């Protein structure tokens, strides 16, 4: 039996990347996994051949007794590791997350198995453990996350719109780099290029207010800018259906689900040329651009908006390339946790 941890995911009112991972894996493991929540879960039900599986963030302070639970080893334990962003980018991360992360990474070393959501995040975790000088650590494998963000079938044919539209999906915060995207878009609008920019994502309560103010100010100047704070999966699907390209100018990612999800919807993606994103962009359908290089970003967005031959090539790659699914991710876990 798999005891699947949904302590935070089960009651989350928003759809962050971490929450989406937990929700989709829970769906994929349904019938073979029992959802549990700390501390109400009766840990006495965990048998020696059972697995406790978590994709959440945790600490001893948030979950009193969790360290003792790992040390006792009443059953087997497995975890999904997302990223070390709170340590690599502390200045743009919630202070609570920054304070929690070192202890969280140390606790991961006490698990029996760990899956990282990308090769890049795997190296971050292993590097932290080496830096800590930990004598004993579990094996860490890479789990390919699903590109199918909803129940809709994969898009294999794209229709062009009369007026080009760009779509950027992600929480409003410095890490997602919407300020940079707004600056680049404003320059392109000022040069006479006509296009719509749709931003989708909740506001980070610690860092997001200045970005929201910038969106409101710029939208008053340009009717092509649209903000959707609480868009449902159905609404996002509609936005993808009318988008010429998605835009991911992010500073850091654990996996880069917005890139994968855009490709699933058949939408080419213009994104930051980060090592972690190259793991998904290398297969085609993407236009990687140097991080925060305004001239290169302006040129890339102009090209994807105006060059039909380039766009057709990227769209063909996006709709034909192999993409991972959540069913495959769940099957990977299911097969591994049966051994």
Which residues make up each language-model segment?
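Carbohydrate transferase catalytic cores enriched for Leloir-type hexosyltransferases
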Residues: 1-339
């Amino acid at each position: 039996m798999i005891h699947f941890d949904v302590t935070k995911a089960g009651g989350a009112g928003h759809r962050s990347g971490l929450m989406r991972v937990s929700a989709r894996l829970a769906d994929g493991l349904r019938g073979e996994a029992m959802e549990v929540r700390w501390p109400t879960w009766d840990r006495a039900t965990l048998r020696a051949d059972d697995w406790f599986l978590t994709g959440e963030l945790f600490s001893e302070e948030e979950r009193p007794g969790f360290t003792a639970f790992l040390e006792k080893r009443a059953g087997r334990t497995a975890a999904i590791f997302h990223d070390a962003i709170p340590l690599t980018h502390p200045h743009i991360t919630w202070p609570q997350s920054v304070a929690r992360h070192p202890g969280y990474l140390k606790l991961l070393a006490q698990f029996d198995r760990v899956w990282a959501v990308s090769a890049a995040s795997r190296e971050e975790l292993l590097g932290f453990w080496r830096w800590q000088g930990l004598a004993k650590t579990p094996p860490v494998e890479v789990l390919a996350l699903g590109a199918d963000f909803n129940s809709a079938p994969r898009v294999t044919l794209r229709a062009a719109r009369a007026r080009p539209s760009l779509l950027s999906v992600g929480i409003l915060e410095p890490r997602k780099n919407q300020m940079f995207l707004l600056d680049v878009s404003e320059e392109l609008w000022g040069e006479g290029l006509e296009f719509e920019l749709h931003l989708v994502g909740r506001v980070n309560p610690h860092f997001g207010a200045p970005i929201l103010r910038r969106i409101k100010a710029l939208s008053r100047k340009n009717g092509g800018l649209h903000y959707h704070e609480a868009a449902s999966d159905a609404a996002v699907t509609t936005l993808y259906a009318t988008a010429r390209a998605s835009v991911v100018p992010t500073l850091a990612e654990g996996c880069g689900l917005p890139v994968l999800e855009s490709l699933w919807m058949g939408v080419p993606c213009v994104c930051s040329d980060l090592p972690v994103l190259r793991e998904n962009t290398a297969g085609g359908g993407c236009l990687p651009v140097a991080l925060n290089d305004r001239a290169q970003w302006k040129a890339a967005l102009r090209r994807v908006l105006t060059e039909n031959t380039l766009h057709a090539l990227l769209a063909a790659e996006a709709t034909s390339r192999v993409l991972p699914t959540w069913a495959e991710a769940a099957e990977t876990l299911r097969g591994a946790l049966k051994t």
